[in-house]
Amino acid sequence: MMRKLKTLPPTLRDKNRYIAFEIISDGDFTKDEVKELIWKSSLEVLGETGTAIVKPWLIKFDPNTKTGIVRCDREYVEYLRFALMLVSEFNGKRLIIRTLGVSGTIKRLKRKFLAKYGWK
């Protein structure tokens, strides 16, 4: 009989922060393109080691409003914001990624920063 692994207590879990962002561009983007954009910009600016430390992860993206949520490590929020800020072009489309805000929970992030874009 296999034993079930115990879950980590909250004191040992990774502390995450969630960043709300908006893509300002004439072109449209899919969730997969945004995921690739975040990874490529993070790798270019921070390198492989830095990206592994920051742990960027796209949680949700709405292609209609071009807004989304990305998760990262609590200690390295500014590194990811910096990496996203430097993006100016992707797949031949000019764009700007604007950070709307940072929060410790997705619920609070939606309520505070993404409510005006129709997120619930």
Swiss-Prot record:
Keywords: Cytoplasm, Endonuclease, Hydrolase, Nuclease, tRNA processing. One of its GO terms (biological process) is tRNA 5'-leader removal. Its main location: cytoplasm. GO terms for cellular component: cytoplasm; ribonuclease P complex. It is found in: Cytoplasm. Coiled coil: none annotated. Part of ribonuclease P, a protein complex that generates mature tRNA molecules by cleaving their 5'-ends. This is Ribonuclease P protein component 2. It comes from Pyrococcus horikoshii (strain ATCC 700860 / DSM 12428 / JCM 9974 / NBRC 100139 / OT-3). The lineage of its organism: Archaea, Methanobacteriati, Methanobacteriota, Thermococci, Thermococcales. The gene is rnp2.
